[in-house]
Design a protein with these regions (language model features):
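Catalytic domains of carbohydrate-active enzymes, especially glycoside hydrolases
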Residues: 24-46, 101-109
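Active-site acidic/histidine proton-transfer and metal-coordination neighborhood
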Residues: 3-5, 62-69, 81-177
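Alpha-helical scaffold elements within enzyme catalytic domains, especially in hydrolases
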Residues: 31-34, 58-62, 101-104, 138-142, ...
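Histidine-acidic metal/acid-base catalytic patches
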Residues: 2-10, 26-33, 161-176, 186-327
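Acidic-and-aromatic substrate-binding clefts and catalytic sites of carbohydrate-active enzymes
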Residues: 18-23, 43-55, 78-91, 118-122, ...
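Hydrophobic faces of well-ordered beta-strands that scaffold small-molecule active sites
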Residues: 9-16, 40-42, 68-75, 110-112, ...
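Alpha-helix N-cap and loop-to-helix initiation/capping positions
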Residues: 27, 50-58, 86-94, 123-134, ...
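Aromatic-lined substrate-binding rim segments of carbohydrate-active enzymes
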Residues: 50-72
Length: 327
């Protein structure tokens, strides 16, 4: 098995990569330790099992015994997002509960999201950003008390880089930062390198995966692929991340499924992107023009758990080689 990455790079696993495993949090930790990573990113509460203090204490003790750092997260904290689950309490109540859990489990951050691409229509996304900023400001004192930072992800096509930057700066970069996802920018017709260049100063943690993008009659198609199989120059992205975000975790979020079509040749598509600068879209177009259709795969199998582990371990091996050659 590959050795651990160099000490100046904290390699991790986002457990969404293993979403079909039906493991306990302790089993997740043991698997990650066997993969010789340093960070385990519990991006959703379901991977922790519960926020019960006894459970969180057990997770913390096992992680410490295995020499692993822990990060935790939740889903939407925007009360007007289509993703938001109000049955779990107000957005503020949910965030405070997560900060308390972060202290118990030893996580320096709480990862959260605004929503998804569905929140861009009818929009405007700026209204959802304002609602999220309001929630964050309402928990500022609690974040200070708990010594926790909130890492907002560019998630599932919800925000472009300049929009997430605005959210962080309006909420307060002293306690709000970014969970930088390398795959999601393409869902917002954005070059991942542009996303990194725009947000690097606010990055607290990350989700890393490779992508393939290519032109088609409607516009472009995007699919997420194992590391090294895409055409977004993921090697350069990783090297740039290590340089611009020193010490920040580089956590694999392996997701491999069929392509998403971005029909930007249809005028209606642009209702979701009325303010996208041409210079930014041009960078996305350049990626698509260099791409070739990605070979079709069996995107879903009877044994999704095995498929997920195979894809993740392929990406981990590639990333370790890349990081070692970079460092």
């Amino acid at each position: 098995m590959d050795a651990r990455p160099p000490s100046n790079v904290k390699l991790g696993i986002d457990l969404f990569s293993l979403r079909s495993q039906k493991w306990t949090p302790i089993q997740f930790l043991e698997y990650c330790a066997a993969q010789k990573v340093q960070v385990v990113h519990f991006s959703e509460i379901r991977f922790l099992g519960s926020l019960n203090p006894e459970n969180l204490s057990a997770v913390r003790k096992r992680a410490e015994r295995l020499g692993l750092e822990v990060e935790i997260g939740t889903k939407s904290i925007c009360p007007t997002s289509k993703m938001f689950d109000g049955t779990a309490g107000t957005a503020e109540e949910q965030l405070i509960k997560m900060m308390e859990a972060a202290n118990l489990v030893g996580s320096p951050i709480v990862r959260a999201v605004l929503g998804s691409a569905d929140d861009r229509i009818p929009g405007p996304i700026e209204a959802r950003i304002e609602d999220t900023v309001r929630v964050l400001r309402n928990v500022r004192s609690q974040a200070a008390d708990h010594k926790i930072k909130i890492a907002i992800e560019n998630h599932a096509g919800d925000m472009q880089a300049r929009e997430l930057k605005m959210l962080v700066e309006e909420a307060g970069p002293d306690f709000v930062g970014v969970c930088l996802d390398s795959g999601n920018p393409l869902w917002t017709i954005e070059d991942p390198h542009l996303t990194l260049e725009t947000l690097h100063q606010y990055v607290l943690t990350s989700h890393l995966r490779d992508s393939a993008v290519w032109k088609m009659p409607q516009g472009a198609a995007v699919t997420w692929v194992p590391m090294g199989r895409g055409n977004v120059d993921i090697d350069s992205y990783v090297r740039k991340y290590i340089e611009l975000c020193p010490g920040r975790p580089l956590s694999l979020e392996s997701i491999v499924f069929g392509p998403r079509v971005l029909a930007y040749n249809d005028h209606a598509f642009w209702k979701a992107y009325p303010n996208t600068p041409a210079r930014e879209f041009q960078r996305f177009l350049a990626l698509a023009e260099r791409g070739q259709p990605y070979p079709a795969e069996p995107w879903k199998t009877p044994d999704e758990g095995t498929r997920e582990r195979k894809a993740l371990e392929e990406s981990l091996a590639y990333t370790k080689r890349l990081v070692n050659s970079t460092s």
